[in-house]
Amino acid sequence: TVNAWHTCPEDGAIRGSNPCSEYMFLDDTACNLASMNLLTFYANGKFDAEAYVHATRLWTVTLEISVMMAQFPSQEIAQLSYDFRTLGLGYANIGGLLMNMGLGYDSDEGRALCGALTAIMTGVTYATSAEMAKELGPFSGYDRNKQHMLRVIRNHRAAAHGTAYEGLNVPAVALDHANCPDQALVQLAKSAWDEA
């Protein structure tokens, strides 16, 4: 299942993850991780989506820069991480955000909000990465993996829009538009993937 979402299968299968399972990619690669505290974007009963998008863009650039200055446990991991420009951006404190919004952690609304925030962050990250690649050139494995990467991006877009997927053996769970408590976030998620 995870390999159906693999952006670089021409360079090998995904065979495992890091210990926390947030990073799944090629053997002997690593990525620098960063997490944004979601609660910092919530004030006066409203989630500041504009600030969240801005922070996502800044962290994407920061993580790209960090590839050049990171220390890795071996030369091979350092080289492959440089070659593939791996980065990992996530968020923390979804529970705190949901509690402050009065939403249950396991509620349909809570899951839909989480899905929308994840879709926004991931779509904006991909779009920002593409902007950097346009100016600086893509990572070295892009050309041989281009069609796979673009299919994965189209499938993320399909999940945001709730449309058909390509080449998945297990259908993805689409963004739950109906239960998201902030419809502006649904629209932002869709537009983020339209831009990616």
What are the residue ranges of the model-derived segments?
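Internal maturation/activation junctions in enzymes
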Residues: A55-A78, Y82, T86, G104-A196
